[in-house]
């Protein structure tokens, strides 16, 4: 087994939220499914998003300089598939309801949370760009259950029975 395949297999065991990352601006509207998204800091609120430079959406995200990370809820599996494949952009966005955040990037109605961001810095790493994104607006939906990708499958999350004290 190659080192690359061993790494991919190991990463399949690392559960992650499923997100649709969207943008709209001078270069047009685009979106893709991503699990390579995480918090960087809360001062100021910043996320990182990893985007393959060979992806068809890369030039649009690069030119627009803004995006929205929409964390998917249970029941969004088909939508994730649309945004993760070669489906034409119009069909992707036609499959759900959207609103606009402060940047104008599409925010998914029914998402667990949407982070509307301005891209502050781009760090190239091998085949990908790491986008450091300043969060400008957060829209939460506390009535939904999360969706994670683990072991190359979707898993719906339910509300915890108990949690840690704040």
Curated annotation (Swiss-Prot):
UniProt-listed SUPFAM superfamilies: FMN-binding split barrel
GO molecular-function terms, A-Z: FMN binding; FMN reductase (NADH) activity; FMN reductase [NAD(P)H] activity; riboflavin reductase (NADPH) activity
Domain of life: Bacteria
Record's catalysed reaction(s): FMNH2 + NAD(+) = FMN + NADH + 2 H(+)
Residues making up the signal peptide according to the UniProt record: none
Pfam families for this protein: Flavin_Reduct (PF01613)
Enzyme Commission code(s) on record: 1.5.1.42
Alphabetical UniProt keywords: Flavoprotein, FMN, NAD, Oxidoreductase
Oxidoreductase as UniProt keyword: yes
Biological process, per Gene Ontology: nitrogen utilization; uracil catabolic process
PANTHER family per record: FLAVIN REDUCTASE (PTHR30466), FMN REDUCTASE (NADH) RUTF (PTHR30466:SF1)
Function in brief: Catalyzes the reduction of FMN to FMNH2 which is used to reduce pyrimidine by RutA via the Rut pathway.
Family listed: Belongs to the non-flavoprotein flavin reductase family. RutF subfamily.
Database matches in HAMAP family: RutF
Protein name: FMN reductase (NADH) RutF
Organism: Cronobacter sakazakii (strain ATCC BAA-894)
Lineage: Bacteria, Pseudomonadati, Pseudomonadota, Gammaproteobacteria, Enterobacterales
Name of the encoding gene: rutF
């Amino acid at each position: 087994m190659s080192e690359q395949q061993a790494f991919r297999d190991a990463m399949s065991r690392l559960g992650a939220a499923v997100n649709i990352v969207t943008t709209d601006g001078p270069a047009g509207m685009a979106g893709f499914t991503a699990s390579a998204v995480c918090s960087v800091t809360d001062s100021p609120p910043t996320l990182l998003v990893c985007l393959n430079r060979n992806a068809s959406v890369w030039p649009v995200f690069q030119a627009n300089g803004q995006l929205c990370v929409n964390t998917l809820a249970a029941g969004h599996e088909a939508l994730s598939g649309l945004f993760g494949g070669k489906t034409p952009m119009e069909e992707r966005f036609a499959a759900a309801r959207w609103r606009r955040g402060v940047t104008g990037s599409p925010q998914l109605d029914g998402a667990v949370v949407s982070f509307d961001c301005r891209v502050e810095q781009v760090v190239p790493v091998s085949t990908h760009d790491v986008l450091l994104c300043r969060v400008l607006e957060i829209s939460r939906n506390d009535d939904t259950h999360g969706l994670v990708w683990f072991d190359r499958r979707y898993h719906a999350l339910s509300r915890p029975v108990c949690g840690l004290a704040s």
